[in-house]
A protein has these predicted regions:
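Short beta-strand-to-turn element immediately C-terminal to the catalytic PLP-Schiff-base lysine
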Residues: 48, 68, 163-167
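Phosphate/oxyanion-binding loops and surfaces in catalytic or ligand/nucleic-acid-binding neighborhoods
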Residues: 20, 81, 159
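Active-site/binding-pocket entry motifs
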Residues: 23, 84, 191-192
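Active-site-adjacent loop/helix segments that line or gate small-molecule/cofactor pockets in enzymes
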Residues: 2-43, 93, 98
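PLP-dependent aspartate aminotransferase-fold enzymes
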Residues: 104-197
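Tryptophan-centric aromatic hotspots in well-structured domains and transmembrane helices
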Residues: 16, 21-22, 63, 87, ...
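Glycine-rich loop-to-alpha-helix module at the N-terminal edge of alpha/beta enzyme cores
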Residues: 10, 54-143
């Protein structure tokens, strides 16, 4: 059975999920016992689960579907691009028309001093790359010791090694010897949470 088009009953999907899918920030045994919520479809700002319950997606698919679901015009453009050139990297002095066109448009829309665009597959990857790029920049400038990054306590920047280090969330730091060296955290801008009157 093709699970992408022919949906099994919720309990069977939950059993397969528990057997094979690792969820982030989750106690897997507890989730396996109760079963994950299975999202079946989405439209606009709403999600529908495999039992037919509809939810407002206030997290925009975890912050990456801020234009809403089911946008036909975007699906059409994406399908056209997938047929022409679904993906290609820009390593090894190579580029492609979508990267050129989007970079030019973003530079046009951005303030005058922001004219160069670097693409990444996720926010976490972008943050990790920025840590490396900033440190490399200062090393090339002859200041390799200028490598301290200041971030906020309780900030979430992603779950990769560098991004979790930037995020000042102690439970994440305890999962793997984080933060990486020279990332320091200052208080979050929350007067009451920090003990203010």
């Amino acid at each position: 059975m093709n699970l992408m088009t022919n949906h099994m009953p919720t309990a069977e999907l939950q059993a397969l999920d528990a057997a094979h899918h690792m969820h982030p920030f989750t106690a897997q045994a507890e989730l396996a016992e109760k079963g994950a919520r299975v999202i079946k479809s989405a439209d606009g700002v709403f999600l529908t689960d495999s039992d037919g319950t509809q939810f407002l997606d206030a997290m925009a698919g975890l912050w990456c579907v801020n234009i809403g679901y089911g946008r036909g015009e975007l699906a059409d453009v994406a399908a056209r691009q997938m047929r022409e050139l679904p993906y290609y990297n820009t390593f090894f002095q190579t580029t492609h028309v979508p990267a050129i066109a989007l970079s030019a448009k973003l530079a046009e829309l951005a303030p005058d001093n922001l004219n160069h665009i670097f693409y990444a597959g996720s926010g976490s990857e972008a943050n990790d790359t920025n840590i490396r790029m900033v440190r490399h920049y200062w090393a090339v400038q002859g200041a390799p010791d200028k490598n301290i990054i200041i971030s906020r306590k309780n900030a979430y920047h992603g779950s990769t090694l560098g991004s979790a280090s930037l995020g000042g969330m102690l439970p994440m730091h305890e999962q793997g010897g984080l933060p990486v060296p020279n990332i320091h955290h200052i208080n979050q801008p929350n007067w009451w949470a920090e003990g203010g009157d």
